[in-house]
Regions:
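Short, local alpha-helical segments
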Residues: 83-85, 112-117
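Positively charged, amphipathic and often flexible ligand-engagement surfaces
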Residues: 73-91
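Catalytic alpha-helical scaffold of carbohydrate-active enzymes acting on polysaccharides/glycoconjugates
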Residues: 1-27, 32-72, 93-113, 120-166
Length: 166
């Protein structure tokens, strides 16, 4: 898509979000982690608080083709349900323990779990409820992404600029 097409898509999506929810969207997430320089430029133009378009270990400011962008990227750190579902090594009864193990193995990190309303909210609702319950029992703290972004941006100079790779 051209820059103009990406811009038109985001403007339309943000207008619909505003119509439905009554307030402006302050973030975006590219489907399938398909982010590029055009989407990053449009995010910067929209002055988004943050985006969550990638996989990674820690928040950063993306750089693509040598150009740095200003919208904070908070990457997903955990696999999505659909990435585990149907794989023989992850039958449903092992998924919750797998997530807990990933979080415990790197407990110092703030983990980001990307969910899909059509999976975790519908088809796998029971499994998602089990995960939430187990996280509660284990003392996992849930925080809002916008609060996390604001906390990070309070010390903007400490956030690294990193190349965004596919």
């Amino acid at each position: 898509m051209s820059l103009a097409e990406v811009r038109a898509e985001l403007v339309a999506a943000r207008a619909e979000f505003l119509r439905i929810f009554g307030f402006e969207a302050r973030t975006a997430g590219a489907p399938g982690w398909q982010s590029n320089a055009q989407s990053r430029e449009v995010y910067d133009e929209a002055n988004l608080l943050y985006a969550s378009d990638t996989r990674g270990g820690a928040p950063f400011f993306p750089r693509i083709g040598g150009k740095p962008f200003n919208t904070l990227e908070i990457p997903s750190t955990l696999p999505t349900f659909d990435e585990l579902m149907g794989r023989p090594e992850y039958p449903d009864h092992t998924i919750v323990a797998h997530y807990l193990g990933l979080m415990k193995a790197d407990a110092a990190r703030t983990h980001v779990f990307t969910l899909h309303a059509e999976i975790e909210g519908m088809g796998r609702r029971t499994l998602f409820q089990e995960l939430l319950g187990a996280c509660s029992v284990e003392g996992v703290e849930f925080i809002r992404m916008d609060d996390y972004a604001r906390e990070l941006l309070a010390n903007r100079a400490a956030i690294p600029v990193r190349d965004q790779v596919r």
